[in-house]
Amino acid sequence: PLEEQSRPINHDLIPNNRFDFNNNDSNQTIIMLGNQTCSRRSIEYLPLKVLEAYLSYGMSAALFKLFREKNGITYDLGVYYPVRSGNAPFLVYLSVTNKKALFAFELLLTLWKDLLLNPLIDAEIHLAKEKLKGSFLLGNQSLDEILQRKIQLISYGISPISEVDLNLKIDEISSLDIIKLTNKYFSKPFLSISGNESICLEIANRWKKNF
């Protein structure tokens, strides 16, 4: 397979250079927090997929439990982590009412810092791995889906592997692997907001104090 051709990661230390907002007059605030990560060819891809599963797969996911189950404050939330031949973005996104925007941002900061400081416990990483395996199975239901996945992998210079080998690779991933990657990629994240200007600027002030 081809060697990974990743571009350098942006580790700009100035918070203002990692913040952007779009002013609009709607009743919603949309928040996105994350950074570019690795390509599909990287050995870091699967650990980040496990993290994605932990955060966003199903009603037992960390994002759902924190924002909807415990606080009931979001319209939409999830993780955007597309497959890319180059460095892929890994973004947590959520939309909330303007009244709940500051509270939602504080919750997101708390979750983000927890990912940087505390490894997933055994039960959390086990459940995330099983969800990830299940998602790969769902993506291979038809011959067309299987062929499309294999063609995509080959186009990236990756040799397709069997389901058994893929599951073995997932099983080998540890909480330590994941927390190393969260600190590598997410200690200096980027923040993008769309919403009321005064709310965006207040979030910006809190952002500068934390990142």
How would you label these PLM feature ranges?
Residues 1-39, 197-211:
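An aromatic/glycine/proline-enriched structural segment found at the starts
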Residues 6-10, 136, 152-184, 206, ...:
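Histidine-acidic residue clusters that define the catalytic metal-binding segment
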Residues 18-23, 76-82, 180:
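Short beta-strand/turn micro-motifs at beta-sheet edges
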Residues 32-38, 68-117, 122-171, 188-196:
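M16 family metallopeptidases and their MPP-like homologs
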Residues 33, 43-55, 64-69:
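Active/ligand-binding-proximal structured segments within catalytic/core domains
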Residues 50-58, 108-115:
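Bilobed periplasmic-binding protein/Venus flytrap-like ligand-binding cleft at the lobe interface
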